[in-house]
């Protein structure tokens, strides 16, 4: 079972940037695990057409910020291929509520009534989970597929070939990716995870204003973090 690049539904600039990764043996292993799970009748999130949504909404040439997550939401209708994000009409998860609280504290932006972060992605925020699929109701169930090899390669390649990117690392899992990033070329902002389990240590990090300050110093347009419709 070979990898056919034409069949990988990912935005063209990213496909070109990552084509060597798609052709490596580990990516074939990911594909094999994924297809086997489908053939076993497993329900997998996000839907197949949204697995690479983070890349499809944030073209490479527009990239400014990378916001790392862990794995997709595992409940029905939540996962949409963007870290922390849920579709319109879906209840806002606790971690995202804390993100909205920090936005309000940091930039005085009223809390959004929905959880769709697509607007951020379209402005150049790569909302990247480390693991890109999950079985329904089984958190981290696809951790053994090998997705981390792919997303680690994405981070390393961005670090090596780009400059002036802002990496937002929230929680220990994301902070462990720091070793993949060249701090001489990029900006790394670390904070506790926004989950309530972190006892609200995330609040007060001011990463939204800090990111925009960095972008302005680089001569780039800031992110409009306001998600209110």
From Swiss-Prot:
One of its GO terms (cellular component) is cytoplasm. It holds the Pfam family UDG. It is an enzyme of class 3 (hydrolase). InterPro entries: UDG_fam1, Ura-DNA_Glyclase_AS, Uracil-DNA_glycosylase-like, Uracil-DNA_glycosylase-like_sf. Coiled coil: none annotated. The active site is at 71 (proton acceptor). GO terms for biological process: base-excision repair, AP site formation via deaminated base removal. HAMAP family: UDG (MF_00148). This is Uracil-DNA glycosylase.
